[in-house]
């Protein structure tokens, strides 16, 4: 079974849609309580066509609306609201979602690069591909935040994916924490 879709109307005019405004009001409630960031799940599924501009357009409107509100309310002096989206796609398709959000989780870096490199002791192409992805992201947002991670609630823990090896899990953590980007550690990942 599945959950019903929320109807935000056309992405280009979603800012006046009652459903959109209700979502914004819910987020403002939490901003008023002191929340300074949000994680958005499955952002490629807001509108059905994952490769059109509808989802990035919606996300840009949502982020811009909330960021303006946040900037007027921030007692902590933060410049911008932090918002990261889960966009489980290859870099080419994912990159345009940076038109909508400042930060996106990078699933490809873990699945295709780090895990392969660590499991196969071969990573000579990893830095070039990583920098190439970041250059692609910059085409859509100059101030993008590359949200790197090893795992999340939809995946096996990194250590499990690495055959249970403590040494490989430590290597994965070292790569995560020393690579460019803003690393995320899914709770419990730090203990294997």
What are these regions (language model features)?
Residues 1-32:
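Chitinase-like catalytic core of GlcNAc-active glycosidases
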Residues 10, 42-44, 154:
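Short, histidine-centered active-site or binding-site loop motifs used for metal coordination
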Residues 18-20, 166-170:
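Short, motif-level signal for alpha-helix interfacial/capping segments enriched in acidic residues
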Residues 25, 39-142, 146, 164-167, ...:
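Active-site-proximal helices and loops of the catalytic beta/alpha 8
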Residues 31, 152-154:
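Catalytic grooves of carbohydrate-active enzymes
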Residues 36, 183:
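Short acidic/polar active-site loop segments enriched in Thr and Asp
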Residues 158-161:
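Surface-exposed cleft-lining segments at the edges of enzyme active sites
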Residues 186-189:
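Short acidic/histidine-rich active-site segments
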